[in-house]
Amino acid sequence: MASPTISSMEQYTPSSKDEKIVPLHGDAAGSDTEKGESREVFQENVDGVEFRTVSWQRATVVFLKINFAMSILAIPGALGALGSVGGSLCIVGYTSLNVYTALVLGDFKHNHTECHTLADMMGLIWGRWGRELVGVQIIVAQVLISAGGIVTSAIGLNALSDHGTCTVMFALVSAILITLFSSIRTFARLGWLTWFGFITFVLGVFIFVVAVTQVDRPAAAPKTGDFELGWAPIAYPSFVVGMINATNIFISTCGSSMFLPVISEMKRPHDYRKACLVAGFIVGAMYLSFSLVIYRWCGTWISTPAFGSAGPLIKKVAYGVSLPGLILGVGIYQHVAAKYAFVRILRDSEHLQANTFTHWGTWLGINLALGTAAFIVAEAVPILNYLLGLAGSLCFAPFSLVFPALLWMYDFKSYKTGTLGQKIKYGLHILIMILGFYMIVAGTYSVAVLIKEAFNTGAIAKVFDCADNSGFVQ
């Protein structure tokens, strides 16, 4: 069957309108590599900054750090709301689905190499306005995730210092450190720091997981007397509680939209699939095993973030070991948003890869603006679960479900009227898109209800609050 035709888009498509592509994520394989390389955002062997230096192994570590992050501190609580069976099914199901849609995005990127981000891809379908709207959505998503990282880092600094100063100051220090890391220009130079961040974060989580099996009772449980652990294979939460916890599990592995800028900096973009599959398997296995152990020993008495569940000493040890990894991981999220805005502003200009004042001023200015925005959001909604829920429903549900399904249907539009098997594939992608729309509406509604409730009950007392947010400090 004939391959779909690339839509002409004046800003990005220098090739003729009748040039054919061969989608990889389907029945055919292969591509015009030479033409694809010529349309890549970053070129090799340039007089300036060399961006195309990332190996597939280093890309794997970046993908691991993007996905294995502060969500592990929220997922055990999600199992408390959904039960071990319901939570496990969500982890396995969402991880598998997110890995699949990540492959869809990678194949689309390979077929349309001029696309640097998801905004560029959606611009092929929706035009200039679509590209700009999705671009804004990318920035909003990363600001929400960065804000969640600032909140969690401030909790860690509070725990380590026994609330040594105003929480706002800890949040400010966290925002500065995250912004400094995100300002490193290339993913290759982020590489060794990313390795360090991933190892320290996993080590901190592992220390906590082992420690939580050795305590008599979770720190949040009653100090004396009998208590009900609350562990259950199947739980029956309210719609709002169930939805936000399912969304928090979903967001844990839906960082595929942030993989795309990394592809543009890989030595061999074709190795993306290998890196994506390896990272997806490792992350899914760690989330499932760690979360089930934590839930088994803490039940419904899980602190948020989860490190507080093992008591004040272990919480300090876990935060002390993992805090560098947490800050470095959130810095990658902010780096992706900054790289999008940077390329958007300087694309096709001499300043994109040249060490000019305009190059540096634009890059550092964008990072400063994003860090400031994330700090303000963190102080306005200082609860990790709600920030993750907002990001998951408003941004990552479209990024990981709706948009990949639309892009697949764009490249395989002929499947709509093809053979029975092709029609079934087309229909399955429509179902993925419908699931995404459901998560947008239901997830946003659930988070809004809980945030309103938090303000009404005093869980969020005020913005820019100096009070200790770490809990159980003794």
UniProtKB/Swiss-Prot annotation:
Main location, first listed in the record: membrane
Induction: Expression is induced in response to 2-benzoxazolinone (BOA) exposure.
Region (Disordered): 1-39
Single GO molecular function: L-amino acid transmembrane transporter activity
Alphabetic keyword roster: Membrane, Transmembrane, Transmembrane helix, Transport
InterPro entries: AA_transpt_TM
GO cellular component terms attached to this protein's record: membrane
Source superkingdom: Eukaryota
UniProt biased composition (Polar residues): 1-15
Keyword Ligase attached: no
Transmembrane segments: 72-92, 133-153, 164-184, 192-212, 231-251, 275-295, 317-337, 364-384, 387-407, 431-451
Entry membrane topology: Multi-pass membrane protein
Pfam families registered for this protein in UniProt: Aa_trans
Compartments where found: Membrane
Similarity-based family: Belongs to the amino acid/polyamine transporter 2 family.
Protein role: Transmembrane transporter; part of the Fusarium detoxification of benzoxazolinone cluster 2 (FDB2) involved in the degradation of benzoxazolinones produced by the host plant. Maize, wheat, and rye produce the 2 benzoxazinone phytoanticipins 2,4-dihy-droxy-7-methoxy-1,4-benzoxazin-3-one (DIMBOA) and 2,4-dihydroxy-1,4-benzoxazin-3-one (DIBOA) that, due to their inherent instability once released, spontaneously degrade to the more stable corresponding benzoxazolinones, 6-methoxy-2-benzoxazolinone (MBOA) and 2-benzoxazolinone (BOA), respectively.
Other known facts: Fusarium verticillioides possesses 2 unlinked loci, FDB1 and FDB2, necessary for detoxification of antimicrobial compounds produced by maize, including 2-benzoxazolinone (BOA). The FDB2 cluster arose as a duplication of the FDB1 cluster with rearrangement and expansion by incorporating additional genes.
Name under which the protein is recorded: Transmembrane transporter FVEG_12640
Source organism per UniProt: Gibberella moniliformis (strain M3125 / FGSC 7600) (Maize ear and stalk rot fungus)
Upper taxonomic lineage: Eukaryota, Fungi, Dikarya, Ascomycota, Pezizomycotina
